[in-house]
Every structure is written in C-alpha cells, then in structure tokens.
C-alpha cells in the first residue's frame, strides 16, 4: 500500500512523540533519583546529569522488549489490515492523549504512571475505531494485575532487605565492621542484576546470541570480580575515610568545648552577636583568636580564618557566619551587608525551620482547629524572627499574635510567656533580629552545658496536656555519620541502575506508538515484523532527558521528600529492590509501572522505619491516581481519534 500521502502523519507523530517523551521525563524520572536527592547524597543538578546518561543507555539497550508489548499486546492489530491509515491515526491519538494528561499531572506535581497513560490511550482510540472487539481484554487484565503486583512485590523485597540491614548493621553499637563486610555483597548484587539485564535483553542489539545459562554465568562472574575489587580497594578506603571523619568531629568537639569554657556570662536583658548593632548604635567590636581587636575591614572579610566574639568562635565562609557548635541542635547562617548587620533567612525546607515549627505551641480554641498545613501558614504569616525567637525562648505563639503587637504593647507579650521562662526573656523583645540571634546563641550555650532539651520541653509543653513519650510508632530512625558514609555512594550506584531500568521500561511508553507508526509507514502493513530501530529508542531517550532538565524537579519533591523521609540506608534498599523488580519485569516483557514499584518500596521502608513517617494522605492520592489515569488518558485519546475518523480522514 502506498503511504507517501501520509508522510504528514509520520512527521506529526515524531513531534508528538518527543512531547510525550518530554512529559515522561518530567514526571516519571523523579522515581529514579527522587530518593537520592531527598536523602541528600546527590544534588538536583548531579541527579539530572546522571539520569541523562543512564536513562538514554537503558532506553537503547532495554527499550525494545517492552515496546513490543505496547505495540502489539494491548490491541489486535490484525483488525486494521484493511484500514492501515486508521491504525496510524490511532497511534497518533494515543500519543496525544498520553502526553496531554502527563503534562497536566506534572504541572500539578502529581506523580502518575506513564504506562497507565499509554495503555489507557491505546484502549481509548481502539474503542472509537472498532469498539470493544479491538481490545485484548486478557492482556489488559494481566497488565492491570501487574499494577498491583509490582508495588506489593517491590515493597516486600525492600522491606525484607531493610530489616536485614537494620538487624545486622544499623542497630549495632559500631555499625562499621558489619557494614564494611556487607559492602562487597551489596555491590555484587547490584552489578549482577543489571549485567544480566543488559546481556539478556541487549545481546541481540549487540549482535550476540547467548543461552540464558551463559548470560547468568557471565553476570555472576562480573559480580564476583566487582565484589573482589570493592573488598580490596573500596573497603579499606572507606574505613580510612570513616576514621578520619570521626577524628575530625572529635577535634571540632574539643575545640568547641575549649571555646565555650571561655564564655563569661553577662547579666543583661540580651546579648548582641557580631554584626548586630549595640544599644548605643556603636559597632560591636570583634576580636581575633588572640584577643586582639580587629577593624571593620577584617570584620567583614570573606576569608576562612576564624574569629571570636564574646568568647565564642565564629568562622566566615564567603560572607556567611556559621556557628561552630557541634551538637547540631541549633544553627544559623548569616549574610553580610554593607550596613554591617548580619541578616538571616530561614527557608521552609531547612532543618531549623522544621525544628522551630515543632517547638511552637499554637493556641487552638474550640471554634478553631488548625491543621498541620495551617501551622506552616501561621509560622510564615507571623513575622519570622518574632515566631522563631518566641519558639526558642519558650513563648507560646497565639494565632492572633503579630509582630506589631509585640512592639506596641510589650506588656501583652509578657502575658503570653509561661511562668517557667526566665525574667530576662520576659523582658526581651521578640520582633527584632537581634533578639533572635541572642536567643539562638543562648540556646546553643545552654545546649552545650546540658539540659536545654528538657528545658525547652518543659517550657513549651501545654499545662493542660500530659506529656507523652514518643511511642515506637512515632520513633524515626536516623543514620549515623558512619552509616551515611557507608551507604552514600551505594545509593548513588543503585539510583543510577534504577534510572537505567527506568529508561528501558518507560521509553516504550513514549516511543512504542511512534515505532508502530514508523514501521507501518515503512512496510505498508500492520504486522510490524521488523525489529525496533535503535535510533528511535535513542530519540525517545533524548526526549526523556529534556523533560527531566526542564520540569523534573517538580515531582522529585513528592517522591524524595513528601511521601516519607529518606536516609541513605533506606534509600539504598528502596532503589535496589524497586530496580530489581522493574528490570525483571522488563526482561519478561511485562510493562509494570516504575511509579508503583518505587511508591511500594518507599511506603514499605518508611512504615518499617516509623509508623508515623509515611504521609498516608499523599499515598492515598497517588493510589487514587492509579485508577484515574487510565480512563482520563483514554478519554483524551478517544476525542482525538474521533476528530481523525469523523473529520480529517472522512
């Protein structure tokens, strides 16, 4: 059949396929590196660079297998033997429907399944073209079943792996020996899974034809070699690195203790920090470590040399003043301006912001019950330094309290302070930057002397509410510095392989219809017997990477931070188990959802770490989206197909 007259449809298909790949990159790639970014092992820029490499490689080596299922496994293409153009229009409609819904979801920061989109879109155009007889319902049932099997299987595997890691490494008094012994095994397992996948699926692309036992033997051999390399070189290097870090932290702690021992208590309503103005508007003098005064030029230097003020060491790095206190309970960063003041901004995602938010007591009347989201709004609405200072000093913040109230009626603010708060703090203004800095400094000193946490707890506790110790469900496990180093690079490696698996699985969602469209145009028939062209898979990989760079960060926040807190150890288990599930599914040609696998692993590990750590409201929304995506994408596709059949092609 002559297809020259329908070249415009092929060109349109290439354009829409790139947009579809863009939407896949903007939405689904967050599944691969979201946890790595959330745990802090890589920055967003580094994640984009690594994902671009591994997504493209995975799409070329693994994408052809799943593409066949998307092209032929959902509908019966033989029904279009006499209406080839109708099938071409259907493939274009499927890409439009899937792309539109994924772009909308990305704009709304809603993580959805790209597999759901393309399956729903394919069914949508088939229902318009041939009714229900065009759909292979048993194949659809298998695919729908895989949507539930994949999160359960991935979650189970992640949970078992995390329990083992916690039992043999995390809960040990010294996790380093067991962790170093397990590193070769972890690396070997990661390498073996992905080498087997490449050899099993990518061998035909590379011109190789090997039996499965040979592929398994090669994978096992490569994993053993890599494990030996890790044991011989990586483990000793990691041991030295951990020992050096612990020694450095010990030295910093001793330095901090020596500095704090020189602090002379000054009985004053409040103390000014370096960079702030004194009460008489004179500049606060700074002294160097030898006790000599330094001039203004030195006070605003951006060098890395330390300085001491009121007996407390401060270090300047690129104009930022950082507290040297090593316990990490309170910390602040300032930025120097020309007027000599140090200005501080607390961001919503910072640890200090969240720490202060937990310490603020919000008065709730019987007629006003504020949700957690309203608590955040209250903290942002009330002048930041007012709320922060009040939180540190133990002053409950009422919903009607404003910064102007504190300055205009200081006696009213005293009424809001509990009896346990010291007299000096009762007389302290809460609406200035100086008072905020003084409160932070005082709290840091008291924290080093001990008892500050108990003091804060007693000051901020509601007298009408009994104090409850955190239950086992509310406790959240934290990675120590040694564990963080052990799993740091390991999570990066598993995230890279997870991105590799995602490229192999989800490139078919964007390129599967385009491959069908191209093969129909090239061969003039619907059987599509030729192999998937590698250059089309590469084209899809480029589109996915473009979407990641432009819009990917919107959904990374949801997967990496909002659903549950991620640590390097938990992130490793999530990445490895979900990647294993996706790679196995890709090799058997089952289009599972990487979103479902990752969500299942994140929820399972988060639930094991802490019963209250999982955002079940967000999980419910994601679960609902699994059901909404198929019909919505199908409706978009059906609408476009109706335009083709009853308008353009009629």
From Swiss-Prot:
Instruction: Quote the subcellular location field of this record.
Output: Cell membrane; Apical cell membrane
A single GO BP term for this record reads: positive regulation of bone mineralization
Keywords assigned by UniProt, alphabetized: Cell membrane, Glycoprotein, Host cell receptor for virus entry, Host-virus interaction, Ion transport, Membrane, Phosphate transport, Phosphoprotein, Receptor, Sodium, Sodium transport, Symport, Transmembrane, Transmembrane helix, Transport
Cleavable signal peptide:
none
> Where is the major localization of this protein?
membrane
Q: How does it sit in the membrane?
A: Multi-pass membrane protein
Q: Which residues lie on this side of the membrane: Extracellular?
A: 1-5, 68-83, 131-142, 213, 504-530, 587-593, 643-650
Q: What is the reaction catalyzed? A: 2 Na(+)(out) + phosphate(out) = 2 Na(+)(in) + phosphate(in)
Q: Name one Pfam family in it.
A: PHO4
Where is this chain glycosylated? 81
Q: Which residues lie on this side of the membrane: Cytoplasmic?
A: 27-46, 105-109, 164-192, 235-482, 552-571, 610-621
Segments of this protein annotated with the region Disordered: 268-310
Residues where Phosphoserine is found: 253, 256, 259, 268, 315, 384
Q: Which InterPro entries match?
A: Phos_transporter
Subunit composition? Answer: Homodimer.
The record's similarity note reads:
Belongs to the inorganic phosphate transporter (PiT) (TC 2.A.20) family.
Instruction: Describe its function.
Output: Sodium-phosphate symporter which preferentially transports the monovalent form of phosphate with a stoichiometry of two sodium ions per phosphate ion. Plays a critical role in the determination of bone quality and strength by providing phosphate for bone mineralization. Required to maintain normal cerebrospinal fluid phosphate levels. Mediates phosphate-induced calcification of vascular smooth muscle cells (VCMCs) and can functionally compensate for loss of SLC20A1 in VCMCs. (Microbial infection) Functions as a retroviral receptor and confers hamster cells susceptibility to infection to Gibbon Ape Leukemia Virus (GaLV) and amphotropic murine leukemia virus (A-MuLV).
Q: What is this protein's record name?
A: Sodium-dependent phosphate transporter 2
This chain is encoded by the gene named: SLC20A2
């Amino acid at each position: 059949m002559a297809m020259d007259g329908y070249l415009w449809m092929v060109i349109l298909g290439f354009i829409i396929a790139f947009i579809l790949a863009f939407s896949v990159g903007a939405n689904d790639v967050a599944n691969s590196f979201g946890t790595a970014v959330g745990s802090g092992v890589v920055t967003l820029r580094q994640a984009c660079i690594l994902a671009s490499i591994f997504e493209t490689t995975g799409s070329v080596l693994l994408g052809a297998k799943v593409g066949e299922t998307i092209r032929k496994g959902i509908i019966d293409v033989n029904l279009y033997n006499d209406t080839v153009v109708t099938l071409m229009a259907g493939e274009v409609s499927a890409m439009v429907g899937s792309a539109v819904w994924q772009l909308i979801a990305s704009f709304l920061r809603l993580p959805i399944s790209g597999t759901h989109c393309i399956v729903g879109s394919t069914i949508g155009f088939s229902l318009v073209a041939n009714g229900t007889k065009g759909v292979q319902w048993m194949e659809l049932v298998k695919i729908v079943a895989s949507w539930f099997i994949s999160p359960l299987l991935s979650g189970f595997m992640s949970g078992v792996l995390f329990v083992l890691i916690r039992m043999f490494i995390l809960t040990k008094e010294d996790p380093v020996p067991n962790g170093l012994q397990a590193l070769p095994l972890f690396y070997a397992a990661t390498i073996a899974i992905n080498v087997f996948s490449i050899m099993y699926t990518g061998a035909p692309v590379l011109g190789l034809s090997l039996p499965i036992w040979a592929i398994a033997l090669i994978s096992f051999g490569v994993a053993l070699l890599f494990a030996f390399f890790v044991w011989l070189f990586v483990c000793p290097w990691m041991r030295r690195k951990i020992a050096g870090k612990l020694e450095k932290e010990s030295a910093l702690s001793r330095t901090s203790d020596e500095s704090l021992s020189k602090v002379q208590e000054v009985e004053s309503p409040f103390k000014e920090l370096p960079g702030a103005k004194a009460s008489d508007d004179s500049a606060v003098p700074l002294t160097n470590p030898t006790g000599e005064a330094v001039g203004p030029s030195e006070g605003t230097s951006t060098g890395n040399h330390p300085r001491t003020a009121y007996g407390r060491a401060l270090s300047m790095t690129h104009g930022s003043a950082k507290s040297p206190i090593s316990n990490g309970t309170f910390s602040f960063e300032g930025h120097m301006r020309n007027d000599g003041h140090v200005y501080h901004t607390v961001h919503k995602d910072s640890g200090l912001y969240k720490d202060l938010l937990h310490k603020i007591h919000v008065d709730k009347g019987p007629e006003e019950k504020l949700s957690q989201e309203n608590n955040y709004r209250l903290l942002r609405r009330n002048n930041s330094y007012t709320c922060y200072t009040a939180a540190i000093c133990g002053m409950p913040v009422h919903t009607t309290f404003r910064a102007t109230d504190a300055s205009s009626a200081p006696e009213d603010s005293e009424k809001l302070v509990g009896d346990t708060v010291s007299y000096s703090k009762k007389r302290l203004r809460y609406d200035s930057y100086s008072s905020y800095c003084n409160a932070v400094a005082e709290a840091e000193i008291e924290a080093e002397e001990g008892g500050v946490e108990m003091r804060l707890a007693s000051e901020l506790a509601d007298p009408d509410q009994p104090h409850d110790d955190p239950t086992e469900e509310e406790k959240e496990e934290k990675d120590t510095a040694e564990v963080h180093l052990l799993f740091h690079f390991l999570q990066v490696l598993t995230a890279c392989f997870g991105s590799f698996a995602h490229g192999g699985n989800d490139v078919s969602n964007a390129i599967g219809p385009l491959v069908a469209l191209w093969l129909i145009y090239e061969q003039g028939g619907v059987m599509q017997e030729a192999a998937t062209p590698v250059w089309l898979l590469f084209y899809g990989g480029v589109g996915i990477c473009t979407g990641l760079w432009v819009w990917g960060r919107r959904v990374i926040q949801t997967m990496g931070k909002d659903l549950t807190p991620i640590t390097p150890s938990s992130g490793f288990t999530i990445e490895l188990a979900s990647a294993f599930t996706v790679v196995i599914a890709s090799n058997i040609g089952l289009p599972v959802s990487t979103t479902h696998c990752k969500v299942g692993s994140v929820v399972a590990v988060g639930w094991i770490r802490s019963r209250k750590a999982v955002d079940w409201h967000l999980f419910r929304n994601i679960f609902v989206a699994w059901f909404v995506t198929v019909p919505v994408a199908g409706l978009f596709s059906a609408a476009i197909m109706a335009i083709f059949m009853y308008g353009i092609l009629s």
